Amino acid sequence: MAYAAAPDRRYRRRHVRYEGNEPPGTIVVDTSQRYLYAVEQGGWAMRYGIGVGEEGRTLKGKATIGRKAVWPSWTPTANMIRRKPHLQQYASGVPGGPHNPLGASALYLYRGGQDTMFRLHGTNEPWTIGQAVSSGCIRLTNEDIVDLYERTPLGTTVLVV
């Protein structure tokens, strides 16, 4: 049986000191450093390694978690299919499961009560953590998205920088 390559060790989940000014309960996504921080009390955060969108494709600024799903289905957007025609084969959707690009869980980013189409989600390609390869979503290993999912209520503020 072949196993997927694991992400680089520096992207493993860690409890770290956090120097930012965001209040506990906030999620901060640092796209340049490839880390997501779940801010906790007392100057601490849980830090996760992430994969980010290709240059210019990741949402920036504030959003909130407007929906959560376990083993979500995935359908590529029309824009994704235009950029990557091979995705046409998935235009009717891919059911949730281990071969789904959204992985084990997804946190849906909303602005003004509307779905932005950007997600924090797991991945079936864990070796891409630390890279800028997605169509704009923020990906974590399946183990990490499950951990983040469990500690993140609806309405959580997400700041993407």
For each of these PLM feature ranges, what is it?
Residues 22, 42, 47, 54-62, ...:
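Exported/periplasmic cell-wall-interacting domains
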Residues 1-83, 96-98:
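Cell wall/extracellular polymer interaction/catalysis modules
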